[in-house]
């Protein structure tokens, strides 16, 4: 009997880890239908968004809880104590208070450990405590890149033999080249986006280095002079450190050319990505970095920070700059405007690179880690 914590996957308005959990669960359903094991999805609310469609050997356990916190440590722990299971998979970096000996945890990155000043102090404390617990008690850890696996091993003394690598995937049914120009134009009108533009996707927070991007874009525009048509579009909800981003935008001499879209539903994102001159991903730290791969799948060139796992994930299919060097980024933006052949080359290379990353292949790597003890 294998249990999966599904509260993240069951959230509306999903971002990173929530989409990761949702996609892996959906792929595991297909891979394990009738496999002889019983699979249980634990959640605090009725399963929705496709999660509720369960194969015969899959079950839902709903544990109601009135508070926005404490579900993992109280009702979920109590359920695991009352009804024993063989294996538990936690898709996010946390453990319940009570859990089976064979518990597997996915750790996406440890940016909070390497760059704590980019996180809320309380979040750093919570994550550090959780990671120490995981290091001591988890049977296996799943990492989303070789880089992240090494980081986890070195920082918390976890034997590398306990760490399994399963690269993230992307939804190729959603993120793909869009040939329907009218549909693209309709989305651009809806979000009031004018071409040409550079695009950044992700939570608008300190660790994503958006303030530096705004500063670089401002310098880029000033140098190109009056009448330059390029815009900067920021897509994603606000996060920790947004005040600095807001201040940088307010102080920019080209703030009228900077558009904040906030959260954009998955169904609309590919249309905006496809229309972008390039995606810029300036993050200080990433365990994997899904938005650049989604952009590549849409045929959009990528300019990325060379930090952490990003060169491992994208190889030679992107242009790279140091996240501390806005001048390097400005140079890359200029190159993609002045060298159309380079843009075509990156688009072609990106399309091929994106094919490597599927949720099915990720689930196929995770499945044997979960079933070896079942």
Segments the model singles out, each with a brief description of its role:
Residues 1-374:
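Carbohydrate transferase catalytic cores enriched for Leloir-type hexosyltransferases
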